[in-house]
Amino acid sequence: MTQVATPDTVQANFDDVTISEVPGRAMHLERHGTEFWAEFDDPGWEGPSNDRPRIMRQVVMITGSHHQQIYWYATGHDRSLNILPGVFLLDDRRWVSRSAVLLHPPDQSVATFNGHWNAICVACHTTAPKTKFDTPFRSEAISQQAVDTTATEFGIACEACHGPGEEHVRANSNPVRRYLSHITGKEDGLMIQPALLDPQASSQVCGQCHSVWEFYELEDERIANSEGFPYRPGDELTDTRFVAQPMGAPDSATLRTFVEQDPDFVRGSFWSDGMVRVSGREYNGLIDSPCFRDATEPQETLSCFSCHTMHKSALDSRPIETWAKTHQVSSNRQGNEACLQCHKTMTPNLSQHTNHQVGSAGSACYNCHMPYTSYGLLKAIRSHTVSSPSVAESITTGRPNACNLCHLDKTLGWTGAALNSWYGQQPPTLNEDETLVAASLLWMLKGDAGVRAL
């Protein structure tokens, strides 16, 4: 996920290559022994664009390993980093403009990514980070701030999910203790095992990163800036941070305060009804799902571990690359088994419930109840709010519904009639276009950028 830039980790070709797929003049890449360098237009230049100087910077770090590589260069100011103007797509083996990958408003300066690593990305792309700005990020030009960002390890290391390991390492430095633990198969109790926590606590381990959240108070942020983020696996996540729930708790006074301070706090990441629409924030979707929110028994409560595993099982015969590309979904949770482990009564009458042939796309629980309505990493991603198809929601939010995401040639009127016939869902009033024109065409022509991408 995060690596030092070395010949073993950099996948793009830096051997005297010119990249034109960037804003302004082309970027030139060079290799100096084991070092990687880039020459490009100075993103911090504030004078006339025709006078923008060129700068040469060393690439020191990489984020991304499955879909793309983002290259970070040392700015020369303290420990602050910035991103090259291009991003390398791994499957396509090509460069694209950074603005095509890291979406931002068209009027936002390209220089605003300076320091993003130190203030934002470091929180989830490293283990035990400390942002260490002398004044709050964005409170003044980063060139005027002292930046001394540190992290214990790059990437998601053991302690990110299992908690501090010092006591565990000290205790198990004794070979006799290690041997006894091995033959008895007992945990030493000195590390957190997320899969053994209750569904809420185990999901919060993932939610520390996979959520839209904010500190409750500025003082909390100041402490985290200097001492590190206070949450540890096994803690109650909401004790130290506010996790946004515009769907499940739209009247939250804390949420209203953040929206007043930043109108994009919600609309930048959620559909208008509060459902998450961007990738990497699946915890917000999970906690608004009835399978999590309304469950009363732990064994029947949906959690991240209901479907995903962070360590590939020895019983999983798939190559590790295949497992990783399925978002680390367990081999026995890729199909309807994920839902039928709880909804057992559906098994003998599945086609009666779905009105589709067993084994077809329309008979897959995921496709109807977790459709591809989130966007990120240049692709559509399944919603992690378990819901049912609704034409009314498509009308009010603009969010594609599961039926029309499969039946691309059908109208919202057609879908409304089918849902009414099968499930008694009252169809909403539609205008002429919604009755006569395929919903997919309406979304492509009238939807916002996120909808068109889906």
Please name every model-derived segment.
Residues 1-64, 70, 83, 90-106, ...:
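Primarily the internal scaffold of c-type cytochrome electron-transfer domains
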Residues 79-81, 85:
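Conserved oxyanion/phosphate-binding beta-strand-loop segments in alpha/beta enzyme cores
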Residues 89, 111-114:
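Flexible coil/turn and secondary-structure edge motifs
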Residues 100-103, 114-120, 127:
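A gly/proline- and charged-residue-enriched helix-loop-helix capping module
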Residues 120-125, 157-160:
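Residues within well-ordered beta-strands of beta-sheet-rich folds
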